[in-house]
């Protein structure tokens, strides 16, 4: 996906105060008012009140978010309707997004003003991501995509009930109205999906017809004669031949909503985050944990960090970890506010490890990528030191959405949010997983059935990679040790005000102790705290903070744990490939293609979220969103190529492609004619 820099909207005001796009020379809404147009063209045009009545969810996709008036009007109508759907999903794409100040200061009609204030408070940085903003306890979900409309349409995974086409006039903004728009709409449309738009341009009507929509003109408003309305009614049932259609069909294993609970194995960060996400979607959960407490193993450190990534290529790794950092920020901010969880979302500093780098080179990278200052800033060592309250050895990145949190408290807060919809079973060790009929049966070490369900999610770290379960994913086990010391045993000038990372990390004082680290060694089973590892961590601390004098070793304590890391350093999140499940009684994979993950058949109702590596907090928060959408059938709040990047089937596909390439090379060499002068040459 090409992530070219995003230009925020340049908005002028006409003499009467109507906002106007400087780029397109067009007004954002008619002078008769934004709310009147939203109601007449979109809410009435798509018959929202009648169509969402009594439904579990309703999905709207808008092209052209503008200043958010259509979303705000839809949200207000949903709130005022006692027969509304349980959940409203509103997806919107905007190539030139407004700023937070634009959202906050634009004049609104009275019914929309309090909602606009809530929207401005949650407004995200202008980055290439799907930004999820949840309102009304998660019942209303706004998903914003900033950047090229055609590029984003190709990345969406959703079944859309109503389309709002609200870009600037086709003559002024043709890129938003080309054939790619209508083709993507046909792919995303649910049966009977509706379309409304204020324009009656012939090219728009013809494009909709060619894509399988029945099109009609309707009376306009605010002095406009006609508007366009349409209904998806293709002559033939679309086949999932496109890349994204195939991807969605094979990997979205929507669980039957027959009252059967979703079973999650593992009550660490990943399992608890998913339990909360499913509870928000109205699903019951049975959460099984072999230990005697929640988040007692790899998730059991006193504190953990979350932050984004800056990389010149802005590839899948950088974009995934950026999205994960945003998800973690939202989760931690909520947990701190609602449950008093120890943590902070006030930012984080990451020292640049490149000895040749300076603040100017860091800023040049920020400028080239076009990332905004409310996501990341490049700071000199002096500026970073002033922010941290300690003397730092190098220039740094300041991630405004970074921070730290107590992982155990965060996990418990997720379960508190889920409430009675989650049944927690501690001390249950899942020894085997078997397929019996159309259900998964989980057995303990005595062969006794613990639970049976149609949908199971493996979030149990090492247990998810038990090869007896047929999971040939390349992962390695990594031991890590963190160290801590009483804040009074350190020079006050060595205790930072906010988290610092780089060659290691150090956190602010938490309950009177400063945590820092961490070592990493592959393999091994030694869980004892090692003095040599404390020395290594103290050395890391000294490389982060200038003149951080080491305390006596006998005053340092610590903790060890293990984490799983995949070969490509990305987590493993999604539906388990059927090609991995022969030992579970499913037989050989029915898949006829293995070259791309999207074509690999999946084990019905079996998912995994594991190998979260060193970014467990952030990856757990985002992984929960990915899996909740896949299980419930809700729109994905993560773009398709990032779902590709963490797909459990990616390793099978890579192995298959390597084998095919080797076979092709062998076949090519076998038919190669002998060189002149060699035996057998003519």
Where are these regions (language model features)?
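Short beta-strand to alpha-helix junction loop
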Residues: 196, 313-324, 354-358, 397-416, ...
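C-terminal catalytic lobe of FAD-dependent flavoproteins
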Residues: 551-682
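Dinucleotide-binding Rossmann-like beta1-alpha1 core, especially the glycine-rich loop
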Residues: 304-387
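Active-site substrate-recognition segment that forms the wall
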Residues: 238-257, 263-265, 269-281, 290, ...
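Helix-loop-beta segment of a Rossmann-like dinucleotide-binding subdomain
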Residues: 114-115, 312-315, 340-350, 375-416, ...
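A short glycine-rich, Lys/Arg-flanked "PGG" loop and its adjoining helix->strand segment in the class I
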Residues: 178-191
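Helical element adjacent to the flavin cofactor pocket in flavoenzyme catalytic cores
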Residues: 397-446, 450-451, 455, 459-460
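The AdoMet/dcAdoMet-binding core of the Class I SAM-like
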Residues: 51-160, 179
């Amino acid at each position: 996906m090409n992530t070219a820099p995003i230009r925020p909207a340049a908005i002028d005001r006409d003499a009467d105060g109507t906002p106007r796009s400087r780029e397109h020379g067009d007004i954002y809404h008619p002078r008769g008012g934004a709310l009147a147009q939203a109601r007449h063209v979109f809410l009435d045009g798509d018959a929202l009140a009648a169509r969402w009545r009594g439904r579990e969810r309703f999905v709207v996709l808008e092209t052209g978010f503008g200043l958010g008036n259509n979303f705000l009007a839809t949200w207000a109508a949903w709130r005022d309707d006692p027969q509304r759907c349980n959940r409203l999903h509103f997806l919107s794409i905007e190539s030139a997004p407004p700023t937070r100040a634009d959202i906050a200061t634009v004049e609104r009609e009275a019914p929309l003003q309090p909602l606009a204030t809530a929207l401005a408070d949650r407004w995200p940085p202008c980055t290439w991501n799907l930004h999820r903003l949840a309102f009304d306890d998660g019942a209303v979900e706004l998903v914003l995509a900033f950047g090229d409309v055609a590029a984003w349409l190709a990345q969406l995974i959703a079944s859309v009930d109503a389309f709002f086409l609200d870009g600037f006039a086709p003559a002024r903004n043709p890129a938003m109205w080309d054939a790619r728009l209508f083709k993507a709409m046909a792919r995303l449309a649910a049966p009977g999906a509706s379309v409304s738009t204020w324009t009656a341009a012939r090219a728009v009507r013809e494009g909709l017809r060619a894509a399988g929509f029945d099109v009609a003109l309707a009376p306009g408003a605010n002095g406009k004669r006609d508007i366009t309305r349409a209904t998806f009614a293709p002559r033939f049932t679309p086949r999932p031949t496109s890349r994204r259609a195939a991807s969605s069909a094979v990997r979205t294993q929507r669980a039957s909503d027959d009252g059967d609970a979703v079973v999650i194995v593992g009550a660490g960060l990943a399992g608890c985050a998913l339990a909360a996400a499913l509870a928000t979607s109205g699903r019951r959960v049975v959460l099984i944990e072999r230990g005697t407490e929640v988040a007692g193993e790899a998730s059991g450190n006193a504190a953990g960090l979350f932050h984004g990534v800056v990389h010149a290529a802005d590839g899948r790794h950088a974009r995934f970890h950026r999205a994960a950092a945003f998800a973690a920020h939202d989760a931690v901010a909520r947990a701190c506010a609602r449950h008093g969880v120890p943590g902070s979302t006030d930012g984080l500093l990451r020292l640049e490890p490149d000895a040749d780098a300076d603040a100017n080179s860091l800023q040049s990278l920020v400028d080239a990528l076009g990332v905004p200052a409310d996501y990341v800033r490049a700071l000199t060592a002096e500026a970073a030191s002033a922010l941290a309250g300690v003397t730092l050895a190098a220039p740094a990145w300041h991630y405004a959405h970074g921070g730290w949190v107590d992982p155990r408290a965060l996990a418990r807060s997720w379960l508190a949010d889920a409430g009675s919809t989650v049944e927690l079973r501690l001390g249950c060790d899942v020894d085997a997983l078997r397929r019996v009929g159309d259900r998964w049966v989980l057995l303990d070490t005595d062969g006794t059935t613990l639970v049976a369900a149609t949908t199971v999610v493996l979030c149990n770290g090492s247990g998810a990679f038990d090869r007896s379960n047929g999971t040939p994913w390349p992962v390695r086990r990594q031991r890590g040790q963190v160290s801590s010391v009483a804040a009074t045993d350190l020079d006050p000038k060595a205790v930072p005000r906010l988290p610092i990372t780089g060659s290691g990390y150090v956190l602010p004082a938490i309950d009177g102790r400063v945590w820092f680290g961490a070592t990493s060694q592959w393999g091994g089973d030694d869980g004892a705290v090692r003095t040599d590892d404390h020395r290594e961590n103290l050395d890391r601390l000294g490389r982060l903070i200038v003149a951080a004098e080491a305390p006596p070793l006998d005053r340092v304590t610590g903790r060890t744990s293990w984490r799983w890391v995949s070969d490509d350093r990305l987590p493993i999140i999604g539906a388990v490939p059927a090609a991995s499940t022969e030992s579970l009684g499913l037989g050989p994979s029915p898949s006829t293609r293995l070259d791309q993950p999207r074509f690999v058949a999946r084990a019905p109702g079996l998912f995994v979220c594991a190998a979260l590596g060193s970014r467990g907090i952030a990856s757990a928060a985002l992984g929960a969103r990915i899996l909740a959408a896949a299980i419930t059938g809700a729109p994905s709040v993560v773009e398709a190529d990032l779902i590709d990047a963490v797909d459990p089937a990616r390793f099978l596909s890579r192995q298959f492609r390597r084998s095919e390439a080797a076979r092709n090379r062998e076949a090519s060499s076998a038919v190669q004619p002998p060189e002149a002068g060699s035996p057998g040459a003519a």
